[in-house]
């Protein structure tokens, strides 16, 4: 009798989470909360949104980038957060974890584009970019982790 492990793992919205410098980042995180991670030390860039009414902004330093979009409610919403240090996912992946560690934690049902491995939830419709989590790799070792929130496609 032989049993093989299931390489498919179910991705839940709660899996789209990472702790950066001790602050939890999820698809529901407020931009103000995320800005506390920077401790006031970040650069800002902005551009008129092609999809939303208002300005899209990027807040970044050497190890963290936060991308936002203007919501229909007038508030600034998280589009994507990308961390290169002091980060751990809800399933225990950190900088320096191997691709095998990622597969053990998240399964093998991912999309690989170059050196980026992505796991996504289904989008609510075909006009949306799906929420997901991704891992940037170098020699199959994690060098950055990102979370993407569902948002309108451009």
What residue spans do the PLM features occupy?
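C-terminal motif of bacterial Sec signal peptides marking the signal peptidase cleavage site
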Residues: 2-3
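Ligand-recognition elements built from short beta-strands and adjacent flexible loops
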Residues: 6-12, 71-73, 152
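N-terminal, intrinsically disordered, polar/charged segments of Gram-positive cell-envelope systems
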Residues: 6-46
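N-terminal trafficking/processing presequences and adjacent post-cleavage segments
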Residues: 14-15, 64, 77
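Second-shell loop/turn segments in exported
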Residues: 18-25, 86-93, 132
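Secreted/surface-exposed cysteine- and glycine-rich disulfide frameworks
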Residues: 28, 90-105
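A cross-family detector of function-defining hotspots
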Residues: 32-72, 99-141, 147-154
């Amino acid at each position: 009798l032989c049993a093989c492990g299931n390489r498919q793992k179910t991705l839940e919205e709660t899996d789209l989470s990472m702790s950066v410098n001790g602050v939890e980042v999820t698809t529901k995180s407020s931009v103000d909360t995320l800005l506390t991670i920077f401790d006031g030390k970040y650069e800002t860039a902005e551009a008129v949104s092609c999809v939303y009414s208002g300005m899209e902004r990027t807040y970044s330093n050497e190890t963290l980038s936060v991308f936002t979009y203007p919501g229909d409610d007038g508030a600034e919403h998280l589009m994507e957060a990308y961390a290169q240090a002091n980060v751990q996912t809800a399933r225990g992946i950190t900088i320096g974890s191997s691709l095998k560690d990622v597969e053990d934690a998240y399964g093998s049902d991912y999309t690989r584009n170059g050196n980026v491995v992505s796991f996504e939830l289904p989008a609510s419709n075909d006009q949306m970019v799906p929420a997901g989590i991704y891992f940037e790799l170098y020699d199959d070792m994690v060098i950055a982790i990102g979370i993407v929130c569902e948002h309108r496609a451009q």
